[in-house]
Amino acid sequence: MINVAVNGYGTIGKRVADAIIKQPDMKLVGVAKTSPNYEAFIAHRRGIRIYVPQQSIKKFEESGIPVAGTVEDLIKTSDIVVDTTPNGVGAQYKPIYLQLQRNAIFQGGEKAEVADISFSALCNYNEALGKKYIRVVSCNTTALLRTICTVNKVSKVEKVRATIVRRAADQKEVKKGPINSLVPDPATVPSHHAKDVNSVIRNLDIATMAVIAPTTLMHMHFINITLKDKVEKKDILSVLENTPRIVLISSKYDAEATAELVEVARDLKRDRNDIPEVMIFSDSIYVKDDEVMLMYAVHQESIVVPENIDAIRASMKLMSAEDSMRITNESLGILKGYLI
């Protein structure tokens, strides 16, 4: 049983913590939180041990939330830390992980240099085996890599061109925007997503463009892939349909808008209405000779959660990629095939 700490209990951290609890080979030893907000109160009510920075102890105790210790105490009780702190904060914690000789999993908001390897379970699990510091790439990059590495099973991917429509903020981020604008992110090519993909697939010819849209629900990707060989649509459909962590959305569902997909998640009784699978619109798949085009939705709050679980096992050399992904998928109810 691996003792896992989660440093940072926000959008990603609380989901990763819940996923750890569901794993047969992991124990959540506690979470680190900086402010006694509603997330901390709910974690306490659920019996999760809460650790805080030294300077925050009094604030938590005055709020009525018992403190199990400092963040350093939490790190010491663990075998490995999943760092889900805000962008850039993980790099500030790395010297502590080094000093205490603890493995750590970082998130895509950190620069690639913070870790020994950038990680996508479907693409490079084996390369990450035994790496002390692993960076799980961002939500958008995770979706790109899942799709690219899956299509690559049919024929070698030679070139990728993708346009990303990014959500402006997560649903709880009330101080972010835009509210009534489309914002290039940035107005240059490529966006940072291409470089992030290349941190995993080093020599891939990829260019990306991105725009921020006034929505909170999901991202959307529009992707054009050039393959080494001529392929048929049925082969692309087959590999997408048979790869876990990818689901197909058929037009017969009459649910193609991202808001409708959230409603589907509600009706399916998904935890927090999460859909960690890449949601590919099956009717968007276009294949001609060596060219593949498709569009898909990305639930930014949950897509990286299974990757974090697999990254833990890879870092600790617990099992093979196939076994880890199977256990993760089964424990979290992650699907393949059609969503409904």
UniProtKB/Swiss-Prot annotation:
Active site: C139
Residues noted as binding NAD(+) in the record, renumbered to the chain: T11, I12, G109, R167, Q300
Enzyme Commission numbers on file: 1.2.1.59
Organism field: Saccharolobus solfataricus (strain ATCC 35092 / DSM 1617 / JCM 11322 / P2) (Sulfolobus solfataricus)
The protein's name in its UniProt record: Glyceraldehyde-3-phosphate dehydrogenase
Catalytic reaction(s) noted: D-glyceraldehyde 3-phosphate + phosphate + NADP(+) = (2R)-3-phospho-glyceroyl phosphate + NADPH + H(+); D-glyceraldehyde 3-phosphate + phosphate + NAD(+) = (2R)-3-phospho-glyceroyl phosphate + NADH + H(+)
Function per UniProt: Can use both NAD and NADP as cofactors, but exhibits a marked preference for NADP.
Domain of life per record: Archaea
Family: Belongs to the glyceraldehyde-3-phosphate dehydrogenase family.
